[in-house]
């Protein structure tokens, strides 16, 4: 109970911190006074990302692991200008190991064992797992980073089709609803172990990077939805969407309905509620309360879910 109370206290403060996103560097806003949450504070994104072409409907989005973000190792050139053996930086090796390790998460969870198996699948020694911490946080953050990159790619490709007149622009509420579902479906191959992943992300040392990834994700969703706001609505819209994502994620972990139908029904209701809110002081108040309550609920729910089989 003491641990839950401590985490809850941290989350309560972070709920309001998310409403003050000025502390995060931003890049895509129309106004120089309106920041945009910086992308992927953690993880190892490559310069040549190989991604699958996603279906236009989020309902058809693949539930399997996404394409790897890989790149060939650079060539080392000595002082004479002759190329020597291929050389990979430590960061590149870590990136490849973590990506390979995701294949073994369904069997081993977010553990050093999964990382060791990933290293061995690349022909490396299992001792390479010692490059990472023992709590699995680096593997989890790597996965979240990849999922966010995949979502960004999906939304970017759809925007291009709309601009070319090859697809119809959806209403904001439907666009956001489909974007959240698309992102949550990426968790399905790992849903058995996702409660444990969230409990690790809620550890004090992991909250800053995980919060950064969350704000980056909802910022992408609103950007591609066409949000042009430069006032306080910029913050409230992202805070509300973050709360919707978090609470729907918790429902998903406990959902035993076919294809998570109950989860998507819950998501529909939350999106409708958010779209029906007026731009008033009441909205601002409910925004903060919804986010804090969602994060507080995460702490309590994860306490009950961690280590349990939710799909048996």
UniProtKB/Swiss-Prot annotation:
- Extent of Acidic residues compositional bias: 80-91
**In the record, which positions carry N6-acetyllysine?**
169
Q: Which InterPro entries match?
A: COQ9_C, COQ9_HTH, Ubiq_biosynth_COQ9
Q: Which GO terms describe its cellular component?
A: mitochondrial inner membrane; ubiquinone biosynthesis complex
Q: Name the residue ranges of motif: SIFI-degron.
A: 17-32
Where does this protein hold a 1,2-diacylglycero-3-phosphoethanolamine? 238
Query: Which Pfam families does the record match to this protein?
Result: COQ9, COQ9_N
Provide the residue span(s) of the region labelled Disordered.
Answer: 43-92
Give me the stretches of Low complexity compositional bias: 52-63
Question: What is one GO biological process annotated to this record?
Answer: ubiquinone biosynthetic process
Keywords noted in UniProt: Acetylation, Lipid-binding, Mitochondrion, Phosphoprotein, Transit peptide, Ubiquinone biosynthesis, Ubl conjugation
What's the main place this protein lives?
mitochondrion
Where is this protein localized, as stated in its record?
A: Mitochondrion
Q: Please outline how this chain is modified post-translation.
A: In response to mitochondrial stress, the precursor protein is ubiquitinated by the SIFI complex in the cytoplasm before mitochondrial import, leading to its degradation. Within the SIFI complex, UBR4 initiates ubiquitin chain that are further elongated or branched by KCMF1.
PTM annotation (Phosphoserine): residues? 80
Give TM segment ranges.
Answer: none
Entry remark concerning the domains of this protein = Structurally similar to the bacterial FadR protein (fatty acid metabolism regulator protein).
Give the protein's function: Membrane-associated protein that warps the membrane surface to access and bind aromatic isoprenes with high specificity, including ubiquinone (CoQ) isoprene intermediates and presents them directly to COQ7, therefore facilitating the COQ7-mediated hydroxylase step. Participates in the biosynthesis of coenzyme Q, also named ubiquinone, an essential lipid-soluble electron transporter for aerobic cellular respiration.
The subunit structure is:
Homodimer. Heterodimer; two heterodimers of COQ7:COQ9 come together on the same side of the lipid pseudo-bilayer and form a curved tetramer with a hydrophobic surface suitable for membrane interaction. These two tetramers assemble into a soluble octamer with a pseudo-bilayer of lipids captured within. Interacts with COQ7; this interaction allows ubiquinone (CoQ) isoprene intermediates presentation to COQ7 and facilitates the COQ7-mediated hydroxylase step.
Q: In which family does this protein belong, per the annotation?
A: Belongs to the COQ9 family.
Provide the protein name. Ubiquinone biosynthesis protein COQ9, mitochondrial
Source species, please? Answer: Rattus norvegicus
């Amino acid at each position: 109970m003491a641990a839950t109370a401590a985490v809850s206290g941290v989350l309560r403060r972070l709920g309001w911190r998310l409403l003050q996103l000025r502390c995060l560097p931003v890049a895509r806003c129309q106004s120089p006074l309106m920041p945009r949450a910086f992308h992927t504070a953690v993880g190892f994104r490559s310069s040549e990302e190989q991604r699958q072409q996603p279906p236009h409907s989020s309902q058809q989005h693949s539930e399997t692991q996404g394409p790897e973000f890989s790149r060939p190792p650079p060539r080392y050139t000595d002082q004479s200008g002759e190329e020597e053996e291929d050389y990979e930086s430590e960061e590149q090796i870590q990136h490849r190991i973590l990506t390979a390790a995701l294949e073994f998460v369904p069997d081993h969870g977010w553990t050093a064992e999964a990382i060791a198996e990933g290293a061995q699948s690349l022909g490396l020694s299992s001792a390479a797992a010692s490059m990472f911490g023992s709590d699995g946080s680096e593997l989890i953050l790597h996965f979240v980073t990849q999922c966010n990159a995949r979502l960004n790619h999906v939304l970017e490709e759809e925007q291009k089709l709309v601009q070319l007149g090859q697809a119809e622009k959806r209403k904001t509420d439907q666009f956001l609803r489909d974007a959240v579902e698309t992102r949550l479906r990426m968790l399905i191959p790992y849903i058995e172990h996702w409660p444990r992943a969230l409990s690790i992300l809620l550890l004090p040392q992991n909250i800053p990077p995980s919060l950064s990834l969350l704000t980056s994700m909802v910022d992408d969703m609103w950007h591609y939805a066409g949000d042009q706001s430069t006032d306080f609505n910029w913050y409230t819209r992202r805070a509300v969407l973050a709360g919707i994502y978090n609470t729907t994620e918790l429902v998903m972990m406990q959902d035993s309905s076919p294809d998570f139908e109950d989860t998507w029904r819950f998501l529909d209701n939350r999106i409708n509620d958010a779209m029906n809110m007026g731009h008033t002081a009441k909205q601002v108040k409910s925004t903060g309360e919804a986010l804090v309550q969602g994060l507080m609920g995460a702490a309590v729910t994860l306490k009950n879910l961690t280590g349990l089989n939710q799909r048996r």
